[in-house]
């Protein structure tokens, strides 16, 4: 007589355990803390705006506004984050924005070169300065913090020397007619306009540049051997070198990428405002580092997230515009910035310790 053996019923808690495991793995991602920060910032300023009787923060135009603000520095934040994951800093990226803008202004307005050529010249010169930064760091072994702190001042001085020797002013206007008729000029000044309740809101090309750079950075970090190299170099340069990773080449390439992103941002700002100013970009280096830290990047290298950095940029954009929409004194922005940075570091450290090994 045949017997039938019943299959053991699945444990009632097994599905729940799998769900918890998935949740833990999601929380173990470097971007988890940044996502929590973004949600928290949005809720806080949504409530403040509501209490102040201004609901603009909750509207689509309001969202376009803070996304545009996030995109501006977000353009340089992704390369800065990758460089930090590799264990290095670039404090010169802010002054590089001003320098590249001045080069564009001088070439286009003073020398009469085509806008597209002026932008390309600025990009090439910026990349050369980035390569010099990287070369000095890898050849001397000096901390990149010190090297780029020095080049920050050198590049800012170069911008001042250029403007004083050519125009005697720190501001150079660029003709809007030439911008609109030039292919690169038209690209960097492009925008999409939307009408909501009779009011026009603009979505500038900077948003698409930011998203494109972030997507490329995320792909490189997560899907290519360069991503493994970047993380390995930041975690242990000696071990990475022993495994055949071209440590010097990786670091120099990242410094060049950071400088290129500064030139891209300078091109956008110069075309948007139809001018160049040596003061433009000042302080952007610290804002970009803040975005990266909020996004989960360790100051010691070897760990971080491009997606988290993008969320960090969004959080700062929300905070900056949320203060405006809530009619709060603008001086509170720096208090909010410091609070977000400290909160993000504490939260990210807790997440790393709590969910270590689950990634």
Region roles according to the model:
Residues 1-47, 235-238, 242-249, 319, ...:
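Cytosolic-side transmembrane-helix boundaries in multi-pass membrane proteins
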Residues 31, 144-145, 171, 202-209, ...:
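Loop-to-transmembrane alpha-helix initiation sites
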Residues 34-47, 80, 153-160, 207-219, ...:
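Hydrophobic core segments of alpha-helical transmembrane domains in multi-pass membrane transport
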Residues 41-51, 59-111, 135-142, 290-306, ...:
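Single transmembrane alpha-helix segments in multi-pass membrane proteins
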Residues 112-153, 311-316:
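Alpha-helical transmembrane segments within multi-pass membrane transporters and channels
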Residues 113-114, 118-122, 128-133, 198-275:
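Helix-loop-helix "hairpin" substructures at the membrane interface of multi-pass membrane proteins
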Residues 145-222, 253, 276-278, 356-359:
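Transmembrane helix-bundle core of multi-pass membrane transporters
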Residues 255, 262, 266, 272-338:
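Transmembrane alpha-helical segments in multi-pass inner-membrane proteins
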């Amino acid at each position: 007589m045949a017997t039938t053996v019943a299959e053991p019923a699945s444990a009632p808690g097994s599905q729940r355990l799998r769900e918890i495991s998935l949740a833990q793995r999601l929380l173990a991602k470097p971007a988890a803390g940044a996502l929590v920060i973004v949600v928290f910032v949005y809720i806080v300023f949504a409530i403040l705006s509501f209490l102040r009787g201004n609901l603009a923060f909750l509207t689509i135009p309001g969202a376009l506004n803070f996304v545009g603000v996030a995109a501006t520095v977000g353009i340089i934040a992704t390369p800065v984050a990758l460089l930090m994951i590799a264990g290095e800093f670039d404090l010169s990226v802010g002054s590089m924005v001003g320098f590249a803008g001045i080069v564009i202004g001088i070439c286009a307005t003073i020398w009469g070169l085509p806008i597209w050529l002026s932008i390309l010249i600025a990009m090439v010169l910026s990349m050369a300065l980035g390569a010099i930064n990287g070369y000095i760091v890898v050849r001397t072994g000096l901390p990149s913090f010190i090297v780029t702190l020095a080049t920050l001042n050198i590049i800012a001085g170069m911008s001042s020397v250029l403007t004083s020797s050519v125009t005697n002013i720190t501001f150079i206007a660029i003709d809007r007619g030439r911008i609109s008729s030039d292919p690169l000029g038209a690209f960097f000044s492009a925008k999409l306009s939307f009408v909501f309740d009779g009011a026009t809101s603009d979505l500038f090309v900077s948003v698409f540049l930011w998203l494109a750079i972030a997507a490329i950075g995320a792909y490189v970090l997560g899907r290519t051997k360069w991503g493994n190299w970047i993380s390995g170099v930041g975690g242990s340069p000696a071990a990475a070198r022993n495994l055949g990773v071209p440590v010097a080449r990786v670091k120099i390439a990242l410094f060049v990428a950071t400088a290129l992103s500064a030139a891209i941002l300078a091109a956008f700002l110069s075309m948007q405002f139809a001018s160049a100013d040596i003061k433009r970009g000042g302080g952007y280096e610290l804002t970009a580092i803040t975005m990266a830290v909020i996004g989960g990047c360790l100051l010691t290298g070897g760990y971080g997230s491009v997606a988290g950095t993008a969320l960090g940029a969004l959080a700062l954009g929300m905070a900056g515009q949320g203060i405006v929409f809530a009619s709060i004194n603008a001086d509170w922005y720096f208090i909010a910035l410091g609070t977000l940075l400290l909160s993000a570091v504490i939260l990210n450290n807790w997440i790393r310790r709590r969910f270590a090994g689950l990634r």
